[in-house]
Curated annotation (Swiss-Prot):
The organism of origin for this protein: Pseudomonas syringae pv. tomato (strain ATCC BAA-871 / DC3000)
Recorded GO CC terms: periplasmic space
UniProt KW keywords: Disulfide bond, Metalloenzyme inhibitor, Metalloprotease inhibitor, Periplasm, Protease inhibitor, Signal
Function: Inhibitor of the alkaline protease.
Designated name of the protein: Alkaline proteinase inhibitor
Keyword check for ATP-binding: no
Family in the record: Belongs to the protease inhibitor I38 family.
A Pfam family the protein falls into: Inh
Length: 127
């Protein structure tokens, strides 16, 4: 085989592989509809459920209600809004800036590691 053949075919193969893997990753992460996540949630540190904050995720303004002052002790300011992401959800300040991103663990649980190492858990209220 000619070396020119390899020089031409390798870049094409790399582009195809990168495109395929990127497309499959994009298909595996679905952006949830905000209505799927709206409702009552509890925010707490792992192992400290008695110190939990009750939050209400709404699809209309005000987007986030409940005990936002309680949540501020971990977020350093009260959250005012939220939005879904393909791999979780984000809590935002009143300007729409992201305060924290919580990773989706399952349909009822989202988690984030705080700078001090504590695990912050957002869990859906059981009806």
């Amino acid at each position: 085989m000619n070396i020119n053949y390899f020089v031409r075919i390798v870049p094409v193969a790399v582009v195809l592989l990168v495109g395929i893997s990127g497309a499959s990753m994009a298909m595996s992460l679905k952006l949830p509809n905000p209505a799927e996540l709206s409702g009552q949630w509890r925010l707490s540190l792992q192992g400290k459920a008695d110190d939990a904050c009750e939050l209400q995720l709404n699809t209309e303004a005000p987007q986030l209600t409940g005990d936002v002052a309680c949540a501020a002790k971990w977020l350093h300011e009260p959250p005012a809004g939220w939005f879904p992401t393909p791999d979780g959800l984000a809590l935002t300040d009143n300007q729409g800036n992201r305060l924290i991103h919580l990773n989706r663990m399952d349909e009822q649980t989202y988690e984030a590691r705080l700078p001090g190492g504590e695990l912050l858990i957002l869990g859906r209220f059981a009806d």
